[in-house]
Amino acid sequence: MEASITLKKVGKLINDKTILAGLTFGIEKGSLVAIIGDNEAGKSMLLRVISCLEYQEYGQVFINGLDSKKRRIEILPKISYVSHELDLDPWLTLEENIQFAGMLYDIDTETINTRLTQYARELHLTRYLKKLVKNISP
């Protein structure tokens, strides 16, 4: 089976510090993968590189055969990353935060709202949509 995600000798530096060094691997479609490691090992950065939120300094990342540096705009609507860090605006409702994120990816309002309703229902989050994020307890 062909890999949906392929990394070839990928490296990432931050302030001349190596975060990722020469990573090469593939993940097949439908696979369940766990990324484990110590704090500051680069797990979050790896996910940010794979999801096109960060560029690697060297090497190549392919998502469904598309080069992430050359075809980022095509890849972004097809992949997402949910950070363990809270990147939501506390003064907006959960619904407004999600709508804003959709607009950043140039998704039309109707599609955003349809998906928002569907996923909120599936994840049992409907009752939180109209609440300010700062008022939602984890």
Language model region names:
Residues 99, 103, 110-128:
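Conserved ABC ATPase "signature" region
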Residues 36-38:
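The feature captures the beta-strand-to-loop junction immediately N-terminal to the Walker
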Residues 17-18, 73:
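Short coil-to-beta microelement around the adenine-binding A-loop and adjacent beta1/P-loop entry
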Residues 132-138:
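Conserved ABC ATPase signature
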Residues 51:
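Helix-to-loop junction immediately C-terminal to a conserved catalytic motif
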Residues 59-67, 75:
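Conserved ABC transporter NBD signature motif
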